[in-house]
Curated annotation (Swiss-Prot):
HAMAP family: Cyanate_hydrat. It comes from Pseudomonas syringae pv. syringae (strain B728a). One of its GO terms (biological process) is cyanate metabolic process. Pfam families: Cyanate_lyase, CYNS_N. It catalyses: cyanate + hydrogencarbonate + 3 H(+) = NH4(+) + 2 CO2. Catalyzes the reaction of cyanate with bicarbonate to produce ammonia and carbon dioxide. This is Cyanate hydratase.
Length: 155
């Protein structure tokens, strides 16, 4: 039976344990996700407290991290999602906020023009990030947000 958190505290505490173990064991997110059948993005988000993991995956990553049975159970619990009460001051996270501040209304206008009145699901959703060479030198981040369009329905 699925269980659900009504507080962020249990997952925040577990996330700290995950990060400590990951660092101590010199593991990567890709290494933790390897062989689970889930994407590195999903497993990373789950280990950072944003998704539950299936039991088999929770057991695999907990073993890799050296976590106990209580951690395996908590990794399967549906979390209280979202961990930012206000705008984060972390520069990487803030840049995403800034992108939405600058391009949010443009994205909204283009989504509505191309799809109609509705939203892009963050539930039926995939996220990918790739590092590519910049022709002008350096590297670029290519981030793909792939969500199902859900139209509003009159009733």
């Amino acid at each position: 039976m699925p269980h659900s958190n009504i507080s962020r505290a249990p997952r925040q505490h577990l996330t700290e344990r995950v990060l400590q173990a990951k660092t101590a064991k010199n593991l990567t997110w890709a290494g933790l996700a390897e062989g689970t059948g889930l994407s590195v993005v999903y497993v990373t988000a789950a280990l950072l407290g944003q998704h539950p993991l299936p039991q088999a995956v929770a057991e695999v990553v907990a073993e890799r991290l050296g976590l106990d049975r209580d951690a395996v159970a908590e990794l399967q619990t549906i979390p209280l999602r979202g961990n930012v009460e206000d705008v984060s001051s972390d520069p990487t996270i803030y840049r995403f906020h800034e992108m939405v501040q600058v391009y949010g209304t443009t994205l909204k206008a283009l989504v509505h023009e191309q799809f109609g009145d509705g939203i892009i699901s963050a539930i039926n959703f995939k996220l990918d990030i790739k590092k590519v060479d910049d022709p002008e030198g350096g590297e670029r981040a290519v981030i793909t947000l792939d969500g199902k369009f859900l139209p509003y329905k009159p009733f």
